[in-house]
């Protein structure tokens, strides 16, 4: 086993036979800032959620097996340089872009957290700071072909819909999800991992359009950073050419994230962590 790279959340090792090992950690990041604190059992939740979704979803994936509580084995493949985001609700960066006039909506913006008429495919580039990219730009920049873009759009929405049904059955609203794909054996295949770091989960019993929603995902940390003014500070430090300094995450936020990550898995998967 040979160490390859360490990302925001997982460490990746190369195995024999064209396979990789993903080792999920308890590390946490938000707004492209890595924090010193860790979220207990987060890695275990992410690992077991990845296994759950890859086994359940109606699309081939690179998943082979789960080897331990925080490790899965996957087939190695050539990842596509595009992140496939599907939004079912008006929230997050989509709402921010509408407010800034970067994108427009027929009839004007709806109330925050409103359900969109149809799931919206909203991909981004893969870069230090992911940037939205439309079909024309994705093709002209050589990220994917027209045929690949259309396939990714259709399949990403299909995956979102399948996940949404499972989330709804467990009492959650799936607001959006980020997916990644790669080329494996001549076919485009679902890759990376899927869990609370890649989607927004809201408790259905507390869902209320027009307001900030309760989160069972990394949004808990983002909301705290926004409310405490740290998001603004991150932007100012970047504008000044300095790397953002991560604040210490309060213990109460850490405890809430652990509890909600575990609860989300146990409710959706229907089994204890």
Curated annotation (Swiss-Prot):
<dbReference type="InterPro" id="IPR001636">
    <property type="entry name" value="SAICAR_synth"/>
</dbReference>
<dbReference type="Pfam" id="PF01259">
    <property type="entry name" value="SAICAR_synt"/>
</dbReference>
<keyword id="KW-0067">ATP-binding</keyword>
<dbReference type="InterPro" id="IPR028923">
    <property type="entry name" value="SAICAR_synt/ADE2_N"/>
</dbReference>
<dbReference type="GO" id="GO:0006189">
    <property type="term" value="P:'de novo' IMP biosynthetic process"/>
</dbReference>
<comment type="similarity">
    <text>Belongs to the SAICAR synthetase family.</text>
</comment>
<keyword id="KW-0658">Purine biosynthesis</keyword>
<keyword id="KW-0547">Nucleotide-binding</keyword>
<dbReference type="GO" id="GO:0005524">
    <property type="term" value="F:ATP binding"/>
</dbReference>
<dbReference type="GO" id="GO:0005737">
    <property type="term" value="C:cytoplasm"/>
</dbReference>
<comment type="pathway">
    <text>Purine metabolism; IMP biosynthesis via de novo pathway; 5-amino-1-(5-phospho-D-ribosyl)imidazole-4-carboxamide from 5-amino-1-(5-phospho-D-ribosyl)imidazole-4-carboxylate: step 1/2.</text>
</comment>
<keyword id="KW-0436">Ligase</keyword>
<protein>
    <recommendedName>
        <fullName>Phosphoribosylaminoimidazole-succinocarboxamide synthase</fullName>
        <ecNumber>6.3.2.6</ecNumber>
    </recommendedName>
</protein>
<dbReference type="GO" id="GO:0004639">
    <property type="term" value="F:phosphoribosylaminoimidazolesuccinocarboxamide synthase activity"/>
</dbReference>
<dbReference type="InterPro" id="IPR018236">
    <property type="entry name" value="SAICAR_synthetase_CS"/>
</dbReference>
């Amino acid at each position: 086993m040979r160490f390859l790279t360490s990302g925001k959340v997982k460490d990746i090792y190369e195995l024999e036979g064209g396979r990789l090992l993903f080792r999920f950690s308890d590390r946490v990041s938000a707004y492209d800032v890595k924090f010193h604190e860790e979220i207990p059992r987060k890695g275990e939740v992410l690992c077991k959620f990845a296994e759950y979704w890859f086994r359940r979803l109606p699309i081939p994936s690179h998943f082979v097996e789960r080897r331990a509580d925080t490790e899965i084995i996957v087939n190695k493949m050539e990842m596509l340089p595009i992140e496939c985001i599907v939004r079912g609700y008006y929230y997050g960066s989509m709402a921010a872009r509408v407010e800034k006039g970067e994108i427009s909506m027929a009839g004007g913006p709806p109330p925050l957290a409103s359900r969109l008429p149809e799931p919206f495919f909203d991909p981004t580039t893969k870069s230090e700071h992911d940037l939205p990219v439309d079909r024309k730009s994705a093709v002209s920049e050589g990220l994917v072909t027209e045929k690949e873009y259309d396939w990714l759009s259709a399949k990403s929405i299909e995956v979102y819909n399948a996940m949404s049904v499972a989330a709804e059955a467990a009492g959650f609203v799936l607001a959006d999800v980020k997916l990644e794909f790669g080329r494996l054996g001549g076919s485009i295949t679902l890759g990376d991992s899927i869990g609370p770091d890649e989607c927004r989960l809201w408790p259905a019993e507390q869902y209320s359009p027009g307001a900030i929603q309760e989160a069972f995902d990394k949004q808990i940390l983002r909301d705290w950073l926004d409310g405490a003014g740290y998001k603004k500070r991150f932007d100012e430090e970047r504008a000044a050419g300095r790397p953002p300094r991560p604040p210490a995450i309060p213990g109460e936020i850490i405890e809430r994230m652990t509890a909600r990550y575990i609860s989300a898995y146990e409710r959706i998967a229907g089994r204890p962590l």
